[in-house]
Amino acid sequence: MLNFNSPIKEQKKYNDLNIIEVEPIIKINLRSNKREFSTKIGKILSILPPNEANTSSGNEKFNLLWLSIDEWLIYSNDKEMSLDDQTNLEDKLFNEISKLNQGAVTNVSDHWVMINLNGNKVYD
């Protein structure tokens, strides 16, 4: 299993701008061009993959971000998701999609960092 070692150790504060890394959460890349894929994801996650550029769909547990015509990124809304739950999700997706040649499932949790920006100068 992945071991998260963040290079960002503290919150950065500037004039009316705060920058902090969001705690590491599971991120899984999905790729498929099969029709059955959307239905299968809908059953597993209770979310239908978005089919328009730069859109997302989600529920209380997960968000699904459209990356390209045949690519999506799942990330968890639950910062407290246990390692067992993360492993179970990845295994379920792998068994239901990759093993059945419906698409590709890749854990990219260590490839992406989520950063929270807040303050009056976020849009400057």
Regions found by a protein language model. Give the residues of each.
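Basic, glycine/lysine-rich polyanion-binding surfaces/domains
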Residues: 1-124
